[in-house]
């Protein structure tokens, strides 16, 4: 972004409420009354909410999120039959909704049609929102009117979730893709059809979950317990750095899988991966609650460990202290993972080199489908 555009962005006051709160107010004050007035016979059939791509759908948006693709918006989800009857006109009416709003000192959002005569202390009118980027337009639009099947297909490639008996299809779906299809909030769903479809994507078959846990155990062992220390001994900082990346990704994913995505959600894409991991770790019911903080320590030390050299750091101690600390954390994480696998009766082995835990976990996979087993 150029200096000029950055200055312009900073000159606009940030909206003090989250995107989800703004979306719910927009639906309640503007969208729902419009549907009741113009489409009364369909009011009991249209689902509304905010799900999909965008920081606000994960609940992690902040002032920095508001310089693009931010503003009052929600989604309306229709059956194929209802979309054929009213979809195009409903989209026109949705786009015509007034989007100017104010936010008072208590955080209450008021849209223009509901503005009070006494506006003292209110947040200044925020207009229609920030500029919309090309990635959120056309076929990639993130709000408005959708067929239910089209909406999920645009995110996952599937109109409905793969069958519970189709593990190969589940394994082709990235966790971040499933996170985008199941995040956000549903404000209204009179028929329950949208929520049922969404729930299908939340309901990862347990055999698939166990297969993914096994895969993550393999990568944690390969990248963190094997290749990382060897790369550091060789002095290959680039290889060590990439090993840390693979180790962190696999370990973070394993934490979400162990906690069961149906309960805690899927791990989102890299930008919000650690925001979600911190939120999960802060839950009183979280499993492996300390792993996220341990991973952040590994990442903080990685520069010194991978590129510190012999004379780096306080007193010229070099990279050795950082390397030792990282290796200790990797092994402690492995110990904690084995304890959790034992607690869940997924293993009877105390072996902490996690590659050797994979057969024990895979013994609990009920299906004989070879895609679920390691080679």
Model regions: which residues?
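Helical scaffold of the NTase/Pol beta-like nucleotidyltransferase catalytic core
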Residues: 2-50
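Hydrophobic, Leu/Ile/Phe/Ala-enriched alpha-helical segments that form helix-helix packing faces
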Residues: 27-39, 90-98, 337, 341
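Active-site nucleotide-donor binding segment shared across nucleotidyl transfer reactions
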Residues: 34-81
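Conserved nucleotidyltransferase catalytic core and NTase-mimicking acidic/glycine-rich helix/loop elements
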Residues: 170-374
